[in-house]
UniProtKB/Swiss-Prot annotation:
Protein residues bound to Zn(2+) 2: C396, C398, C450, C467
Tree of life domain: Viruses
The organism of origin for this protein: Human adenovirus C serotype 2
Keywords linked to the UniProt accession: DNA replication, DNA-binding, Early protein, Host nucleus, Host-virus interaction, Metal-binding, Phosphoprotein, Viral DNA replication, Zinc
Protein known as: DNA-binding protein
Biased composition (Acidic residues): 156-165
Family: Belongs to the adenoviridae E2A DNA-binding protein family.
Length: 529
């Protein structure tokens, strides 16, 4: 109480120097006053109360309510003047809470005020919009709703144009970017439309490995238009067109840069045979030297093959009685060649490690290898390599499907030398074509047949699959050359098509065991219980 009375004395001026309503002069201020300074008004205590809104949806808010001080018995005029000069502080509003993702903004005015919008990485995703006034709204996006791009002002576009020009990659050719499959399909459809392929084949064509039939139809139409009456030697028209379709498929995949991991489109390989280097020496697919083995053939006298043998091979064929006392035509070949793994096997029987190569006449087989080598040198005289390679198919119609299982018998097409009858009587001086002279000087051809062929008037050995695949080595090379001509007539650039080199593998071995094969069944349970 004493201190409060002292503060009140300091606010009261001295008597004779002025009243409470008249402020003192400068002289009075300059002179020291023995009274203390006037006391300050005590701060108003504020009481925090919780006010409930009348609206049930709004949440309760906290407001600051000034607490009225308790009345005092005596209050001076100076205290009232000082208290009136102080401004009353307004209660600070509570910051707004962020809206929930359930809020949907659909008004046009709010859309115009949006300055930035982004997509939040949540589940479900939300579209977050920031207005120009600092307002932030959130809208939930459905799966089918398109994501709107952020709206930018013209000034922002001008500022970011330079940065975008540096990061944008421009196609120098100004061409649309397409996939490799679309590129191959476009080229294939152009060929099928031009050469009038069947609509069913065209509609089902998807550039798959097993769809060679549609491309073979293209090659067949092209042959009928450009090379009518094509001469083939020991080759069926169906096999020739099929091999052209395979080569065309390889060019399409190379053009579109489409590859399949476990499928080679041509179904061929280049074999470095080395069978024409040393006289009398032949090598099998293993790369080993083939051994000599006597081979005896017996045919019925009344059969067509027996009569032909008596006529064409009168020096070797003779009529004898077999062990059952019947007259047969017997041909004994002492120059037969077989794989080294078949030395202990009878004629026309092979071991489990054999490559399946067998020649009844080794000399004729070597003449056929010399013919294809001379044919390659005549066709490509300036080639540095490749004259000693043989383009050979690895798949016939039996094992042409991708992912086929090994079957009983030979796994590679059978390689057989065929003699050219009456070719020795031709005068070589009258022929100027070197490719034709290759067959005149070496009158035998290598012919590729089905892996396990079934001849006329004979039964299938082992009951394995068989087909009518048959094509000679020169015609196989001509099929590749004609596909290149077909491609050059329709496209400007010829892609690079690589035929793999042949390497021996255990998957090419002769199979003496027939494995059971399962067939797909749509039923869930095998039996009805």
């Amino acid at each position: 109480m004493a201190s409060r009375e002292e503060e009140q004395r300091e606010t009261t001026p001295e008597r004779g120097r002025g009243a409470a309503r008249r402020p003192p002069t400068m002289e009075d201020v300059s002179s020291p006053s023995p009274s203390p300074p006037p006391p300050r008004a005590p701060p108003k205590k504020r009481l925090r109360r919780r006010l409930e809104s009348e609206d049930e949806e709004d949440s309760s808010q906290d407001a600051l309510v000034p607490r009225t001080p308790s009345p005092r018995p005596s209050t001076s005029t100076a205290d009232l003047a000082i208290a009136s000069k102080k401004k009353k502080k307004r209660p600070s509003p509570k910051p707004e809470r962020p809206p929930s993702p359930e809020v949907i903004v659909d008004s046009e005015e709010e859309r115009e005020d949006v300055a930035l919008q982004m997509v939040g990485f949540s589940n479900p995703p939300v579209l977050i919009k920031h207005g120009k006034g600092g307002k932030r709204t959130v809208r939930r996006l459905n799966e089918d709703d398109p994501v709107a791009r952020g709206m930018r002002t013209q000034e922002e576009k001008e500022e970011s144009s330079e940065a975008e020009s540096e990061s944008t990659v421009i196609n120098p050719l100004s061409l649309p970017i397409v996939s490799a499959w679309e590129k191959g399909m476009e080229a294939a459809r152009a060929l099928m439309d031009k050469y009038h392929v069947d609509n069913d084949l065209k509609a089902n064509f998807k550039l798959l490995p097993d769809q060679v039939e549609a491309l073979a139809a293209v090659c067949k139409t092209w042959l009928n238009e450009e090379h009518r009456g094509l001469q083939l030697t020991f080759t069926s028209n169906k096999t020739f067109v099929t091999m052209m379709g395979r080569f065309l498929q390889a060019y399409l995949q190379s053009f579109a840069e489409v590859t399949y991991k476990h499928h080679e489109p041509t179904g061929c390989a280049l074999w470095l045979h080395r069978c024409a280097e040393i006289e009398g020496e032949l090598k099998c697919l293993h790369g080993s030297i083939m051994i000599n083995k006597e081979h005896v053939i017996e045919m019925d006298v009344t059969s067509e093959n027996g009569q032909r043998a008596l006529k064409e091979q009168s020096s070797k064929a003779k009529i004898v009685k077999n062990r059952w006392g019947r007259n047969v035509v017997q041909i004994s070949n002492t120059d037969a060649r077989c794989c080294v793994h078949d030395a202990a096997c009878p004629a026309n029987q092979f071991s489990g490690k054999s490559c399946g190569m067998f020649f009844s006449e080794g000399a004729k087989a070597q003449v056929a290898f010399k013919q294809i080598k001379a044919f390659m040198q005549a066709l490509y005289p300036n080639a540095q390599t490749g004259h000693g390679h043989l383009l050979m198919p690895l798949r016939c119609e039996c094992n042409s499907k991708p992912g086929h299982a090994p079957f009983l018998g030979r796994q590679l097409p059978k390689l057989t030398p065929f003699a050219l009858s009456n070719a020795e009587d031709l005068d070589a001086d009258l022929i100027s074509d070197k490719s034709v002279l290759a067959s005149v000087h070496h009158p035998a051809l290598i012919v590729f047949q089905c892996c396990n062929p079934v001849y006329r008037n004979s039964r299938a050995q082992g009951g394995g699959p068989n087909c009518d695949f048959k094509i000679s080595a020169p015609d196989l090379l001509n099929a590749l050359v004609m596909v290149r001509s077909l491609w050059s007539e329709n496209f400007t650039e010829l892609p690079r098509m690589v035929v793999p080199e042949f390497k021996w593998s255990t998957k090419h071995q002769y199979r003496n065991v027939s494995l059971p094969v399962a067939h797909s069944d749509a039923r869930q349970n095998p039996f009805d219980f």
